[in-house]
Amino acid sequence: MVLLYRSQRLFTIDKICATIFTGFNNNLYTNHILKEFIYFMQITFPSYYKKFSCIADACPDTCCAGWQIMIDDKSLSKYRHFQGSFRNRLHNDINWKEHAFRQYGHRCAFLNEENLCDMYIEAGSGMLCDTCRRYPRHIEEFEGMREISLSLSCPEAARIILSQKDPVTFRTFEKETAEETYEDFDYFLFSALMDTRDYLLTVLQDRNVPVRYRMAKLLVCTHDFQLAVNKQELFSWETIRARHEQSGFSSAFRKKISGRCFPDMDRVDLMKQIWKTIVPKLEVLSPDWTVFLKDTLISLYHTCPEETSYMELLLDFQDTFPEWQIQKEQLLVYWLYTYFCGAVYDEKIFAKGKMAVICTLFIEELVLGLYARKREKPEPGELVSVCYRFSRELEHSDQNLNTLEELLDQEEVFSLEHLMTLCSI
């Protein structure tokens, strides 16, 4: 089965061979080939992917604390039948009902005082489950395709992502694999999502345009894409997307964006409302996170209680730290690449676009809070800390990811008009 990308149509090798060998139906070699099937998997990853190497005990944090590490079925079976000297501890420190490692003080039961893994030390690397072996490598699965990224929740991965100066590119290769079938996988929608994401990545990486307009284009495109799907008019989206591409970032587009803002809603008030809408609904994975979030936002909003002082701080921050615009771009690209095409499973296209913008703006607000304290450019380590801590609270919890998406999809505060206000500067 050969995957023809972009259209996502599947053809068997017998159909291809039938075309190639037309007129040679009596050829025994040809008849043999026609009975064979070849399946290929397409694997995509960002250009910085291979730069990652675990820094072990030099890491400022551990990847084995603050979240419940789920165990895949194959590893669980391996642990159940393990006969070595490590067997008793292995069996005692696994929650067999939940298929997860037990935690003590929010730390994995196998994490020792040196922040190293006792399972790795005592039983070897072959005993690690899929999650522990792959992390921070994150995999999104689609039929005939895997998309790999480095999770922002890892300090070293966050450092790599933030340090990219050039626009990120994505590399793809194929490998022969076993056949797989996903029930009810919508290839037409997936093809439209892939094509649209390609276009939106180009939009987000257009450095001739201020980031705020790039975010606005992302939002209006995903909004219109969602409308087409809701109306069951997916066939019309290609034409609509072409109009978005043609309009670019013209003065007419910028004027239209300004006209979609709510005139009675200041950015600072809107951001406060968004924090209040989301934070109470999310589970807290690290006790330190609540303290950090409260202290940082108090620094920001007490220093700048009104729109005028807030905007002055934001403009001062942008002047002092111009390279943030590139890092902001890298974050937008990270969120969009990782989650957008997952809309093939739930059709929440606009919510995925909102997620890229809101998560990036959340991180920006926290960085701005740090800036409000010192009025000097944040250190690279401070930026990394904000990014990976935010990511851990969100991406290490399926419950939090699902809750955020539901809020983005349903709450009025996340309407297009409100979000255009956030793109006004």
Language-model segments: residues:
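Polybasic, low-complexity association/targeting segments
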Residues: 48-96
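Immediate flanking context of iron-sulfur cluster ligation sites
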Residues: 41-59, 91-129, 146
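Low-complexity, intrinsically disordered or signal/transmembrane-proximal segments
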Residues: 5-8, 29-32, 39
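Internal, well-ordered alpha/beta segment that forms a basic, Gly-enriched binding/recognition surface
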Residues: 115, 123-224
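Hydrophobic, aromatic-lined core segments that form the binding pocket/scaffold
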Residues: 209-425
